[in-house]
Structure formats: C-alpha cells, structure tokens
From Swiss-Prot:
Bilayer-crossing regions: none
InterPro entries attached to this UniProt entry: BsdC, PAD_UbiD-like, UbiD, UbiD-like_C, UbiD-like_N, UbiD_Rift_dom
A family per Pfam: UbiD_C
Entry note: cofactor: Binds 1 prenylated FMN per subunit.
Residues holding prenylated FMN: 161-166, 182-183
Organism lineage string: Bacteria, Pseudomonadati, Pseudomonadota, Gammaproteobacteria, Enterobacterales
Family: Belongs to the UbiD family. YclC subfamily.
Protein name: Phenolic acid decarboxylase
UniProt catalytic activity: 4-hydroxybenzoate + H(+) = phenol + CO2; vanillate + H(+) = guaiacol + CO2
Length: 475
C-alpha cells in the first residue's frame, strides 16, 4: 500500500495496533519528547504516538515515533509488520532497481487550504513548537523535508534536492538551518552565494513516510528523490507546485513554508541534541526568511526525537543508508555481498565481500569512504568475508576475534573529511578514518595460518526450518 500523506500512514499504523493515542493532558515539555524517548527504551515493536491534549495549545495534534520500530518501518513500505529487518532491506534493494519512476503532478493539495504571507506570518501561532532535549538552544523543525534547486541548472529535475536538515525556529518568520557541507543543499547554497543571490527553498512538514525516508537517503547529486520515492512505493509519487517558489513539493504534506536562505548571512544556531547521541554546540549557521506559509486546516505536526541510539532516527536512516551504499559499491565491485551501515547514520559500516586478490577488501573499504555518503560519514569500516553476514553481529565479532592481526589489518587514514557533528573529530569536520580488515588473506597475502573454516553441516538448514516450525506449532 502506498501512502499519499501522513494521515493515511497514521491510520495504517492504528489498524496494525502500532499507534498509541495519549488522551490524558500532557505538557509540551518535557512530556512529548520524553514519551518519544521512552519508545526507544521499551524494546521491540515500539508504537507511534499521537497527542491531541497538550496543555497551553489549542487544537494541536502531534505525532511522534511514526517510523520508530522495525514494525513501523515495515508498514511504511507496505510490508507486513513482522517482516524481518534483513528482508526489509532486501525489499528496499529490489525496489531500488525500479528507479526512476516519474512522479504524478496533482492539483488541489490539502495544504493550500490556508495561506499567510510576509509580515503576517507567525510560526509560533501555526506550529505547536517544543524542545526535544533539555539542552537544546530552542525549538527545532527536525523532520521536515527541504526542497532546493541548483541555481545554475534550475530546470534539471534530478538536481532538485529533497533533504532533511535541522532548523531552529528563531523568530516569527526566521529559521536557522544547518547545511552540512557534504549535502546537496550546501552545494546549491554555495553556487547561489557565489552569484550574490539568496537560495529559494520550500520546507515541507508532516510528510508521508516514503518521502521522509528519501530525505534521509544519500542519493547521487542528479538522482531525484521523487523518482526514487516512486520506485520505493512502486507507484508514481504525488507532487504539487508550491505557489511562491514554483518548486515541486509533496502533494500530501500538512504544511509548506516557502522563503530563502539569505546570502552570506550567518547567525549562531544551536546547541541541539543530535543523532550522534551528543549535543552539537552553537555554531554560525545560515538564516532562512519565510515569506509564505500554506497549511491544512488543523495540521498534524510531526517531530523526531534524537538522542543516544536507538531512537526513531536510527530506524529512519538505517536501511536508507545501507541500500545506496550497497548499490554504489556493488556497481563497481560485483564481489560485494552486503552492507550494514545502520549504526549512527553509517559512521561505522560493515561490508562483506568476496576477494579477487590480496588487499582487495581494503580497496572496497577505501571506496566506501569516498562514496557521496562516505565522504561525510563513513569513519570506520569493518571488512568481512562473503560467508559472514554483516547484519549478524555474533558472526562479525567472530571475524574480528579470529581474523584480525593488529600488526597488519588496521589501515589508518589521517586527516580525512567527516561531518562536523562527529563529536570525535578534531578540528570539527576532520578525523582519521580506519579500515579493519577481518577477511581471510588470499594470495599474494600469505599472512597468518588459516586452516579451512568450520561451516554448518549440510543438514543444518533443514533442521533449523524443522525446529522453527515445531516451536511455532507449540504457541
């Protein structure tokens, strides 16, 4: 099932028993964020949360943790809630091959029901804003998709970017936005500022789950998130035209903010509790001026709790990081078998591969660090043999324990790029990177004395299936 908006997704979650509606009156702070934080601490099957009785707000409706469990992630893809994680990733890979699917342009989006312009805009009246962590420097929009275009090639649909970037609400119509240098919006901004121009943007809030997943997926610069969203949902993705910028935005969004990133203007933004589980400090960041707001009557506001993993962002970004990294590596190295980059947005990646010759696994690890995502994120790579499942951590630990000799299997690369939010980088944005080669050496590499590995007996698979069926029959 393809969801055209957030509301139909919430209904599906409710139908599957994966939406908890909190009827009691709650405080915006700390209850909303604390409840979302708690979903990551109660184990498997954490539900989405719905709040509509929030002290101090009139008619506020807030959804949290909508993709914050593997069950919810499966539902977002139209899969049964009990679909195993590896099968969800395999399905993501299968659908990826459908790219591109052209979007469907629709008229009469619900977000056009109400509009506010210019100095009449007051985001504090329109949005039920609250802090997510007690050390945050202000209110944040952290699950919105930001649409921007290449100023030098504005009609190139593929170069129109849809990405998720945190934004601090700093005034009635002013935001602070962090454009990470490795992301497409930073390239768009750089081109605009070289010309002395503001960068027009459209910000979409309360989105369907597929475009949210796409906003967190590191595609190539000229790959369209809308065309990939169509591939992932297996039907054309619905878009509409934003009235001020003329940009393509999701047809089903709850709220559309349009304005500009003001050229060469910077102000202190932050701190903010980040996906790394640490606060990013206050830094000079770009300033956004909002010139037009369009919104549904009684819009649903959605926010994303971030903190020490796992939280919703880890479910959101995990498969969305594994799959493009796998596809980009597989295109150049067919020997690559699987990529697990689910941990902290791929700051650590585990890659299994066959080997053509000695040193081959390290070459794959190096390439992972220079993919579009790897330049800013992949800080450590663990390379394992093709018979090791990178999603099976006991197998990975076995490979590390039995195959790694620190004398020759650690490859340290000094002074490499990483996103500034990496708390271990020094200075911010610069780090050493590490490849751990936990593969069995092959010629001409003759280090170690590896005998033939012990493998499962031929009958093991059949017995595993038989025992699983017997256990299921007892329940």
């Amino acid at each position: 099932m393809a969801f055209d908006d957030l509301r139909s997704f919430l209904q599906a979650l409710d139908d599957h028993g994966q939406l908890l509606k909190i009827s009691e009156e709650v405080n915006a702070e700390p209850d909303l964020a604390a409840a979302a934080n708690a979903t990551g601490r109660i184990g498997d099957g954490a539900p989405a949360l719905w709040f509509d009785n929030i002290r101090g707000f009139t008619d506020a409706r807030v959804a949290m943790n909508t993709i914050g469990s593997w069950q919810n992630h499966a539902i977002s893809l139209g899969l049964p809630p009990n679909t195993p994680v590896k099968k969800q990733i395999d399905e993501f890979i299968r659908r990826w091959d459908n790219f591109p699917i052209a979007p469907e342009r629709r008229a009469n989006p619900a977000w056009a029901q109400n509009t506010v312009d210019g100095d009449e805009i007051n985001l504090f009246d329109i949005l039920p804003l609250f802090r997510l962590n007690d050390g945050d420097g202000g209110f944040y929009l952290d699950k919105a998709c930001v649409v921007s275009r290449d100023p030098l090639d504005p009609d190139n649909f593929g170069k129109q970017n849809v990405g998720i970037y945190r934004m601090e609400v700093k005034g009635k119509r002013k935001l602070g936005l962090q454009p990470v240098p490795m992301h497409d919006i930073a390239l768009h901004l750089h081109k605009a500022e070289e010309r002395g121009e503001d960068l027009p943007i459209a910000i979409t809030l309360g989105n369907d789950p597929i475009i949210t997943l796409m906003g967190a997926t590191p595609l190539k610069y000229d790959q369209s998130e809308y065309e990939m969203a169509g591939a992932l949902r297996e039907s054309p993705y619905p878009i509409a035209t934003a009235p001020l910028t003329g940009f393509d935005v999701p047809w089903g969004s709850e709220v559309i903010l349009e304005g500009v990133i003001e050229s060469r203007k910077r102000e202190i933004e932050g701190p903010f509790g980040e996906f790394t589980g640490h606060y990013s400090g206050g830094r000079n960041m770009t300033v956004v001026r909002i010139d037009k707001v369009s919104y549904r009557t009684r819009p649903i506001f959605e926010s994303l709790y971030l903190g020490m993993p796992w939280t919703e962002i880890d479910y959101l970004m995990g498969p969305a990081t594994c799959v493009p990294l796998y596809q980009q590596l597989k295109a150049e190295f067919p020997e690559v078998q699987a990529v697990n980059a689910m941990y902290t947005h791929g700051l650590l990646a585990i890659i299994s591969t066959k080997k053509r010759y000695g040193g081959f696994a390290r070459a794959v690890g190096l390439r992972a660090m220079t993919t579009p995502h790897g330049l800013g994120y992949v800080k450590m790579v663990i390379m394992v043999d093709e018979d090791v499942d990178p999603f099976n951590l006991p197998q990975v630990m076995w490979a590390l324990s039995s195959k790694v000799n620190p004398a020759g299997d650690l490859v340290q690369l000094p002074n490499m790029s990483v996103l500034e939010l990496d708390p271990g980088s020094s200075p911010a944005g610069i780090t050493d990177k590490l490849i751990i080669d936990a593969t069995t050496p092959v010629a001409p590499d003759n280090r170690g004395h590896y005998s033939q590995p012990v493998v499962d007996l031929p009958e093991t698979k059949a017995w595993a299936e038989k025992l699983t069926a017997m256990l299921a029959a007892r329940k």
